[in-house]
Amino acid sequence: MSDSPLSKRQKRKSAQEPELSLDQGDAEEDSQVENRVNLSENTPEPDLPALEASYSKSYTPRKLVLSSGENRYAFSQPTNSTTTSLHVPNLQPPKTSSRGRDHKSYSQSPPRSPGRSPTRRLELLQLSPVKNSRVELQKIYDRHQSSSKQQSRLFINELVLENFKSYAGKQVVGPFHTSFSAVVGPNGSGKSNVIDSMLFVFGFRANKMRQDRLSDLIHKSEAFPSLQSCSVAVHFQYVIDESSGTSRIDEEKPGLIITRKAFKNNSSKYYINEKESSYTEVTKLLKNEGIDLDHKRFLILQGEVENIAQMKPKAEKESDDGLLEYLEDIIGTANYKPLIEERMGQIENLNEVCLEKENRFEIVDREKNSLESGKETALEFLEKEKQLTLLRSKLFQFKLLQSNSKLASTLEKISSSNKDLEDEKMKFQESLKKVDEIKAQRKEIKDRISSCSSKEKTLVLERRELEGTRVSLEERTKNLVSKMEKAEKTLKSTKHSISEAENMLEELRGQQTEHETEIKDLTQLLEKERSILDDIKLSLKDKTKNISAEIIRHEKELEPWDLQLQEKESQIQLAESELSLLEETQAKLKKNVETLEEKILAKKTHKQELQDLILDLKKKLNSLKDERSQGEKNFTSAHLKLKEMQKVLNAHRQRAMEARSSLSKAQNKSKVLTALSRLQKSGRINGFHGRLGDLGVIDDSFDVAISTACPRLDDVVVDTVECAQHCIDYLRKNKLGYARFILLDRLRQFNLQPISTPENVPRLFDLVKPKNPKFSNAFYSVLRDTLVAQNLKQANNVAYGKKRFRVVTVDGKLIDISGTMSGGGNHVAKGLMKLGTNQSDKVDDYTPEEVDKIERELSERENNFRVASDTVHEMEEELKKLRDHEPDLESQISKAEMEADSLASELTLAEQQVKEAEMAYVKAVSDKAQLNVVMKNLERLRGEYNDLQSETKTKKEKIKGLQDEIMKIGGIKLQMQNSKVESVCQKLDILVAKLKKVKSASKKSGGDVVKFQKLLQNSERDVELSSDELKVIEEQLKHTKLALAENDTNMNETLNLKVELKEQSEQLKEQMEDMEESINEFKSIEIEMKNKLEKLNSLLTYIKSEITQQEKGLNELSIRDVTHTLGMLDDNKMDSVKEDVKNNQELDQEYRSCETQDESEIKDAETSCDNYHPMNIDETSDEVSRGIPRLSEDELRELDVELIESKINELSYYVEETNVDIGVLEEYARRLAEFKRRKLDLNNAVQKRDEVKEQLGILKKKRFDEFMAGFNIISMTLKEMYQMITMGGNAELELVDSLDPFSEGVTFSVMPPKKSWRNITNLSGGEKTLSSLALVFALHKYKPTPLYVMDEIDAALDFRNVSIVANYIKERTKNAQFIVISLRNNMFELAQQLVGVYKRDNRTKSTTIKNIDILNRT
C-alpha cells in the first residue's frame, strides 16, 4: 500500500521484536561499577552473538560469568570448558592451604542440566584473579553499606512475660546484650517459649507458636489452673555502634515497649508504650525499624534453617515465594513487576489498535482512488456553469439599469407625500403620547386612591381595635379605683381601730401595773397583820386548839371547791368572749351582702342601657348594609350597561371610519373605471378590459374567502404595456385617482392544470369561472395555489403538511405560506368578486348621505355615553360614602359590645362574690346552734358556779362560826386584829378580781391589735398592688389614646389626600377627552392623505414589480459554492476536514399576496419607497453575490446584449444536456479527508505504541540493572561467607537463564570443601545448614536487619562448624543483635550475655549472666 506508514512486513517484524531490547549503545551507557566485575585489560573482548528477536527460554541452571565493562550480558558456561574460577575473597589475609592448594583456585562448573539447549552459543571468559581481589570486593561492600548506613539501630533489652505458656506469673527474661546473647537451659525448660513470646508480640498466629488457639498460650498448671489472660512486653532500646567496635545506648531516642495481651476468648490487644494500638500499627512500626516481617529473615526456628537454601529458583504460583522473589524483595526490584506487566498489556492492546487502524486506512485509500475520474468531469461542468451565471448576471443588471431610470421621477412625488403624512403623524403621535401620559397619570392616581382606601380600611380596623383596648382599660381603671377606695377606707378604719385598741391596751397596762402595786402593798400588809393575828392566836393556842383544828379540817375540805370555782369562773369568761365574737361576725357578713347587692343592681341597669344601644346600632348597620348592597347591584348593572354602551360606541366609531374610507375608495374606484371605460369607447386606447373581479364569477359561499385572499381583484386588466401607460397618463393628467394594472402580454404561461391537495380541499383558482379563457392567467397570477378550507382546524391541517399551502377559510381567516395568520375581526372583506347570482358587489359601499347619518348617530351616542358615565360616577361616590360609614357603625357596635362584655364579666364576678358572701352569712346564721351551744354552755357554767357556791356556803358558814368562837375567846383584841386581816383580804380580793379583769381585757385588746395590724397589712398590700396596676393601665391607656389621636390624624390625612386625588383624576379626565377629540380630527385628515398616497403608490407598483422581478432574477443567480470542497481537494492545505459540505441551493420563491388596501398597505408602500434606491454601482458592494461582480453604469451601457444572449443560449444547452453528479466532489473530498485522518490516526497509534515500548524497555532495563547489581553483591558476599564458614568451600547464586534472570529464576549451587559443585538438594543436613547460614549472613551484609533470633541452628553441625558459626556471629555481626538458643557449649560460651532458663513446679523461670571472660576480652 503506497501511503501506509506501516507495511504488513514491518508490522510482522515489529510483532516479533523482543520485549527487552539490549543493544550495544545501552551497554556502553551503563557504567555502574557495582553492577559488574571488570575483567583483565589483557583479556580480548569476545565476539558477542547477535541477539535474535525471539529467543528460546532454557530452564537449565547455568553458572553466571560476567563479561567486560563494555558489555554487561551474561552467558551460560559449558561444562567442557576449562577456565580459572573466580578468586574467592577472604576477610582474613590469604594463607597457603595446608593441603598444598595454590592461592589461585579455579572453580568447577555446576553439573549440566539434561535439558540444556545444545544450540545456544556460549562463551567462557576467564576472570582475572587480580581484578577480583579482596580489596576490590571490599570497595563494593563499603560503597553499598555507606548508602544504607544507619545512625542507630533497635535491639531487645528484655522480655516481660506474664502467664505466657510455661512462664507463670510475671517473669523478666533478660536483659539481652546489644550484639550476641544466648538462651540456654535443659530440654523442656521453655527456651523455645522465649522465641514464641517474641513471635506473639510481633503478631504471629498461634500455630506458629506450636498452639492451636491464642487461649492455649495462657499458662495452666496445678497452681494456676484457670488464668484469664497472658501478656508479653518486649522492651526495645536504640543503640549506636561505634567505629571502635563497641556500642552505646542512644540517649536521645526514648525506649520502645510493645505489648500484646491474649484473653481466654481467643482475642488479643496490642499496646505501644502502654497505649492501646493495633496489629497494623505494630507491624508498620517494626518494619520501619528494619525488622523483616515479610520474609522473616530475622527468625530462624528449630528445624527451619535448611528451608532458606532449599527455596525453588522461582515461585510456581503468585502466592508462593521462590529464591528469585526472595532476592527481588530484598534488593527492591519487585516494585517494577506491576509496572512492566501494565506496559506489556498496553502494548498488546495498542498492537490490536494499530492493526485495526491500518485496515481502515486501506479501505479509505481504495475508495478515494475510485472517485478520481468523476472528479475531473464535475470540475469541467462547474466551470461552464459559472460562465453561464456570470452572463445572466450581466443581462439582468442591464435591464435593471433601464427600469431604475423610469422609477426616479415617481419616487420624488411619493417622497413629498410621505413627508406631509409623516408631519401629520408626528402631531398625532404627540397627541397619543400625551393621552398615554394622562392615562398613566390617571392609573397612578387610581392606584394611589386604591392605596388610600386600603389604608383607610386598615386605619378603621386599627381604630376599632384601639377603641376596644381603650374601653377595656377604662373599665379596668374604674374597677381598680373602686377597689383602691374600698381598700383605703378599710385602711383608714383599721388604723383608727388599731389606735383605739393600742390606747385601750396602754390604759389597761397602766391599770394592771397600778393594781399589781396595790396588791403587792396589801399582800405585805396582810402578812404583817396576819403575823400579828397569828401571834395573838398563838397566845390563845391552848384555848382554841380544838377549834383551830376543826377550822383547818374544814378549810382542807373546802380547798378543792375553791379550785373548781376558780376554773368555772375562767370558763365563764372564755364563753362570754366567744359569744361576743360570733355576734360581731354575723353583723359584718350581713352588711357585706347588702353592699354587694347594691353594686349588682347598678351594673345590671348599665348593662341593659348598653344592650339597648347595641340593638339600635345594629339596626342602623343592617339598614346601611341593605342600602349598600342595593347600591352595589345598581352600580354593577349601570357599569355593565356603560361598558355595553362603550362597545356599541366603539363599533359605531369603527363603522363611521370604515364608511368614510369606503366612500373615498368607492368614489376613487368609480371615477377611475368610468373614465377608463369612456376612454376605451372613444377609441383612444385598445386592450382595456376593466376590473379583474368583474372578469369572472364565483359561488356566493366563497365571496368572503376570495375577497380576503385576493385584494388584487380591484386591479385593472389590460393587454399591453402601452395601453397601461396611456391609462396612467390619462389618470395623472386629469387627476382622477390611481389604479394598478395587470398586463396580459407580460404574464408568463402558468401550469393551470388541477393539483393534488390535502383532504381534497378545493383550489380557489378552480372555483373561479373567467368570462374569457385568456383571463385565466391573470386570475392565476393573483390567486396561485391558494386553497379553501371550511374552518380553521381544517385550514391548519392543510397548511402545515409536508408541503406548505396558502389556505383561506370560508369565513375569511388566512394562513400564509410563511405560517402567519390574518383575517377575522369585526370587518369582513367581501364583494371584490362578481358572484354567480349576479348580485351587486356594492354591499359595503356608502353614499354621502349615509355617511352623514352615521356620524350624526355617533355624536348622539357619544353624548349619551358621557351622561351615563357621569351618572355612574355619582353612584360610585354615594356607594363609597355608604362603605365609609359602615366601619364607623361597626366600631361603635364593637366598642359597646366590648363594654357590655366587660360589664357582664364584672357582673358575673360580683354575683359570685354575693353568692359567696350570702353563703358565708347563711353559714354564720345557720350556725345558731353553735351560738345556742355557747349560750347554753355559758348558762350551764353559771349554774354550776352557783351550785358550787351553794355547796361551799355551808362549810364557809361553819368555818365562820368556828372563827367567831375563836374571836369570842380572844376577846376584842383578836376580833379587831381579825377584822383588820379580813379588811385587807377583802381589799386584796377586790384588787385581784380587778387585775384579772384588766388582764383579760388587755389580752383581748392585744388580740385585736394583732388582728387589725394583719388587716392593715393586707389593705396596704392591696392598695399598693392596685396602685401599681393602675399606673401600668394608665400608661397603657395613655399610649392607646395617643395611638387613637395618631389614627385620627392619619385618617384625616388619608381622606384629604383621597379627595385631592379624585379632583386631580377629574381634571385629567377632562384633558383626555379634549385630546381624544383632536385625535378623532386627525383620523379624518389621515384618511384623506392616505387616499392621496394610494393613488401615487398604485402608479409606483407596476414599476416596482418590474424591478422586483429583475432583482429577484439577479439575486437568485449564484455561483455554486464549492470553495470548501475544492479547498478540501488541496492536499497541501488539508489538515482536518469536516464531512459536511454546504452547497448554495436555489430557493423557490413562493407567491406573496400584494399589499391590502388598508393602513398596513400604505405603511408597507411607504417603507418600501423610503428604503428603495435605484441601482448605483458606486454606492453598493462590488459583488451581487459571491463570485458575481456588480458592474458600473458605464460598463453596463457598453455591453453587447445580443452577443451575451447568444452565449447564454449556447451554455444553457450544454448545462441542460450534460448529466454530471456534482456530489462526487463532496464524496471525493470526504474520502480524501478521511484518508488523511486515517493516516494521521494510524501514525499516532504507531507512535503511541512505540512510546509504550520504549517505556517498557526502560523499566526492564532498570529492573535488570538494579537486580544484577544487588545480585552480584549478594552472590560474591555469599562466596565469602561460605568460604569463611567451610574453610575452603565455594557457593554461588546462579541465574537459570543467564540472558533473562527473571524468566527461570535463581539457583543456589554449593561446592563443599574437597567436593564438586552440587545442587543444594543433594547436600547433607549439616551442609544445608552451613549453606543457609552463609546465605543469611550474606543477605545481612547486603541489607542488615537489627535483630536475629535463632533456635538451635547448630543442631546438625559438628564441633568445628559450630565454633566457626559462633565466632562469625561474635566477631563479624556487631551491627545487629543475635539471640541464639543453643545447647552447644562452643556456641553459647562465646555470647556476651547468657540467659538461663529453668523449670520448677511446672513453672519456667529465668536468670541472666554476663560472660565476663568474653566481655573482658572485647
From Swiss-Prot:
Sequence positions bearing Phosphothreonine: T43
Binding site for ATP: G185, P186, N187, G188, S189, G190, K191, S192
Subunit-structure text: Forms a heterodimer with SMC2. Component of the condensin complex, which contains the SMC2 and SMC4 heterodimer, and three non SMC subunits that probably regulate the complex: BRN1, YCS4 and YCG1/YCS5.
Domain commentary: The flexible SMC hinge domain, which separates the large intramolecular coiled coil regions, allows the heterodimerization with SMC2, forming a V-shaped heterodimer.
Parts forming coiled coils: 345-673, 849-1172, 1224-1263
Molecular function as annotated in GO: ATP binding; ATP hydrolysis activity; chromatin binding
Main localisation: nucleus
Every SMC hinge domain range: 686-799
InterPro entries: P-loop_NTPase, RecF/RecN/SMC_N, SMC, SMC_hinge, SMC_hinge_sf
Top-level taxon: Eukaryota
The keyword Manganese is annotated on this UniProt entry: no
One cellular-component annotation, GO: condensin complex
Similarity comment: family membership: Belongs to the SMC family. SMC4 subfamily.
Record's protein name: Structural maintenance of chromosomes protein 4
Organismal lineage: Eukaryota, Fungi, Dikarya, Ascomycota, Saccharomycotina
SMART domains xrefs: SMC_hinge
Annotated compartments: Nucleus; Cytoplasm; Chromosome
Positions carrying Phosphoserine: S113
A GO BP entry: mitotic sister chromatid segregation
